[in-house]
C-alpha cells in the first residue's frame, strides 16, 4: 500500500515496512527549527522533540518538492539491515537521477562549521544558537554548542536522487 505524508510530524510516529511512503512538500519531524531566544524556549523545543522511526526495508519516495526535515530536539530512527535497507528516492523507478526531490536534512544543537559560520554558536555562552540553514526558507534555524548532540540513528539507509536547489549556492 501507499501513503502520502505532508506537514509536521508532531508526535512519535513509525513508518511501517508494508507501506510505501511518499513525501509531499516539506515534512518536518518536530518543531525545533524556530529561533530560540531563551532557556525556556530551548527547554520547550527539547521537551517537544519527537521521534520518527522507520522500519527496516521501508521505501520512502520524495515528490519533486519532497523533503524530510528532522528539526532540533527531534530524532530519526532509521535502522535498516544489510538484507533490508531503508531506501529514500524519487518517485521514478530508477536510481540514476539527481535533483529529483529534496532529500533528508538533519538539524540539531551541534556546533555549526563551514560556510555561514558567524561564530555565534561559540560566543553566545548558551547551548543553542540560531543559524539559518541552506535549502530554502522552510529550513529556518538550527545550531548549538552541544558537540555530542544526537539526532537519531541512520544505519543501512540509501538516499538517492536528492538535491533541491533553492537558489544560487543555496541547496539541499
Where do the protein language model's features map onto the residues?
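Beta-strand/loop edge motif enriched in small/polar residues
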Residues: 1-172
